[in-house]
Curated annotation (Swiss-Prot):
Protein name per its UniProtKB record: Large ribosomal subunit protein bL9
Organism, scientific name: Corynebacterium aurimucosum (strain ATCC 700975 / DSM 44827 / CIP 107346 / CN-1) (Corynebacterium nigricans)
Taxonomic placement: Bacteria, Bacillati, Actinomycetota, Actinomycetes, Mycobacteriales
Purpose of the protein: Binds to the 23S rRNA.
GO biological process: translation
GO-annotated molecular function: rRNA binding; structural constituent of ribosome
Top-level taxon of the source organism: Bacteria
Family stated for the protein in its record: Belongs to the bacterial ribosomal protein bL9 family.
A cellular-component GO term for this protein: ribonucleoprotein complex
The entry's keywords: Ribonucleoprotein, Ribosomal protein, RNA-binding, rRNA-binding
Length: 150
């Protein structure tokens, strides 16, 4: 039986792949669970169209990530103001959200806090730090920021 997978199936394939399976496995497991559809000419053409659209979207996402990385490289003064003691220790620590807000305040792009990769150990003192931003699987941006007393 020829099927088109709609979801990843272990030891069988990824979504969009056309696979040949035994009739019982297809009828009793894959089709009822919505993991596959019967391969017809129309379904194959539809899957090809979806794959082309996904490839085009991936290229656009990669180009957009590169543009954001360029904008981040142009940023100069990214300051994260925090409450500190007289000795320079922070009350708390600097979070990913603090960094994203500081980048936006410095004129950079608006970012999602989930892409921020904080340096090893928490930022607990004032000073200069560097953080990586995972903009895309193939694009990593870096931002230098200063933690200053508020």
């Amino acid at each position: 039986m020829k099927l088109i997978l709609t979801a990843a199936v272990e030891n069988l394939g990824a979504p969009g792949e056309i696979v040949e399976v035994k009739d019982g496995y297809g009828r009793n497991y894959l089709l009822p669970r919505g993991l596959a559809i019967v391969a017809t000419r129309g379904a194959e053409k539809q899957i090809e169209g979806i794959k082309r659209a996904q490839e085009a979207r991936a290229i656009r996402d990669l180009d957009h990530a590169r543009e954001i990385r360029t904008q981040l490289e142009e940023l100069k003064d990214v300051n994260v103001p925090v409450k500190t003691s007289e000795s320079g220790k922070l009350f708390g620590s600097v979070s990913a959200e603090d960094i994203v807000n500081a980048v936006a305040a410095a004129g950079g792009p608006k970012l999602d806090k989930r892409i921020v990769v904080l340096p090893k150990g928490l930022v607990k003192k004032t000073g200069n730090y560097q953080v990586e931003l995972k903009l895309h699987a193939d694009v990593i941006g870096k931002v230098n920021f200063s933690v200053v007393a508020a």
